[in-house]
């Protein structure tokens, strides 16, 4: 009975000292997120890459050290990143222990169907969101995405379409509520606020530098 109220053991590393994601999102995440851009070997000639065996070793080491927060995107390593992370989670039976962040907007099918035939696999519009999330769920072998990033603003899709589509997605429970906008121009953020189109219960506007 005493064990019922015993404190959790000290983590083996500081990576395991989890913290609350934000004031509006109580999920606990590791202080560092593992970036998945180099998980895969399709981009070996232009960016970092690794074999599936080495990728699994990296993911194992990250989890064993206490990490639970993994970032990827629909297009990383021509879709290998999401697929390998999904395969790893299934093989280790760890989906419920991992917080997954992925992204849509970038054309993730050009390598497969060819340039000029993949226009609706990219951008911020409703169709792009639908097919990207559908395929990310399949590759990650999961029923939900914890955090979904709008990877970049396409300056063509309307704010109304984007925000309405994201809101519907959250209501369908395909994303665990948290939707983040990366590189959102200040003008659009002001318009979203004015139009009261905030995705509920949380919309975070995040400005980042460089490629992610």
UniProtKB/Swiss-Prot annotation:
Keyword Ion transport assigned: no
E.C. numbers: 1.1.1.-
InterPro entries given in the database record: AKR_Detox_Biosynth (IPR050523), NADP_OxRdtase_dom (IPR023210), NADP_OxRdtase_dom_sf (IPR036812)
Disulfide cysteine pairs (residue numbers): none
MF GO annotations: oxidoreductase activity
Pfam family, one: Aldo_ket_red
Active site residues according to the UniProt entry: 76 (proton donor)
Keywords: Oxidoreductase
Top-level taxon of the source organism: Eukaryota
Protein family according to the UniProt entry: Belongs to the aldo/keto reductase family. Aldo/keto reductase 2 subfamily.
Protein name as it appears in the record: Putative aryl-alcohol dehydrogenase AAD6
Gene that specifies this protein: AAD6
């Amino acid at each position: 009975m005493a064990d019922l109220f015993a404190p959790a053991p000290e983590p083996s590393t500081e990576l395991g000292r989890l913290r609350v994601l934000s004031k509006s999102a109580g999920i606990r995440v590791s202080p560092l997120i593992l970036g998945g851009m180099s998980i895969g070997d399709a981009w070996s000639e232009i960016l970092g890459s690794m074999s599936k065996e080495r990728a699994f070793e990296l993911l194992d080491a990250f989890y064993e050290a206490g990490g639970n927060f993994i970032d990827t995107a629909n297009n990383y390593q021509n879709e290998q990143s999401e697929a390998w992370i999904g395969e790893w989670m299934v093989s280790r039976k760890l989906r419920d222990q991992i917080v997954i962040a992925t992204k849509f907007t970038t054309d993730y099918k050009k390598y497969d169907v060819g340039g000029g035939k993949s226009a609706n696999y990219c951008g911020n519009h409703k169709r792009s969101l639908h097919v990207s999330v559908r395929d990310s769920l399949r590759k990650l072998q999961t029923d939900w995405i914890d955090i979904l990033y709008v990877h970049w603003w396409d300056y063509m899709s309307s704010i109304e379409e984007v925000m309405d589509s994201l809101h519907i997605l959250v209501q369908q429970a395909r994303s665990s509520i948290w939707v983040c906008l990366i590189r959102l121009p200040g003008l659009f953020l002001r318009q979203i606020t004015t139009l009261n189109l905030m995705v509920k219960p949380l919309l975070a506007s995040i400005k980042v530098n460089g490629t992610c």
